[in-house]
Amino acid sequence: MIELFFEEKFKIFKSIEYALIQKLYEELIQVYINDGIVFTMGNGGGTSVANGFAVDLRTHPFTHEDKSVTTEVRRIRVIDLSESSGMITGIANDIGPESIYSEQLKNWFREDSVAQKNLMIAFSGSGNSKNIVNAIEMAKKYGVTTSCVSGRGGGAASKLVDIPIIVPGNSNFPGQTGKNDNNFHIEELQVSVGHILTGLLKGYVNQKGL
């Protein structure tokens, strides 16, 4: 069974459209250059992916080789909409779970946000979760470049975003049932996309001598 897991994983990872990850990286660089904001969000395991990605993106590209040495490099601005349990549960209780991310965006978007270079990256198993779709729709109204890393065909989100990254295939590995039959590999690819973007941004910062 262990061999099955890795066989599936390698097959799926080789089927990804690497050009879309490259495109997402290029958008990320433009956000950094123009001092925009990266918004992240997810559901379930995707929430953990969004959390970890936000932490990595805020720190690793700007960390000295000796981690105890602080740097003055200008960092990228990242807001993880999945981060505050108080905010999420408050909105879910008062308004509804479908609004937990779109309501938070009202704190950040203004009329002049359209002129800014911002990026939203969502991590979703199916791409159909209403809270994800609602946030993407609002972000697009304010000119935000949007991406969703998801599986099972990409769902509604993949039809809305500028850069849909869809994890293909199914899994026969146990522990995944029903519509989550490829959930393990979807989440692993989501984590990998975050690591790739973080590493490439680190390379950019080093190359520019920032």
Which residues does each PLM region occupy?
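Short glycine/serine/threonine-rich phosphate/pyrophosphate-binding segments
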Residues: 46-51, 128-135, 157
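A charged, well-structured terminal subsegment
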Residues: 107-113, 173-210
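Generic N-terminal amphipathic, Lys/Arg-enriched alpha-helix
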Residues: 1-16
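A short, well-structured juxtamembrane/interface segment
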Residues: 16-34
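Glycine-rich, small/polar surface segments that engage phosphate groups of diverse ligands
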Residues: 30-112
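A short, small-residue-rich loop immediately preceding and capping a beta-strand
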Residues: 36-41, 115-127
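Short, glycine/polar-rich helix-capping loops at beta-to-alpha or helix-loop-helix junctions
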Residues: 148-161
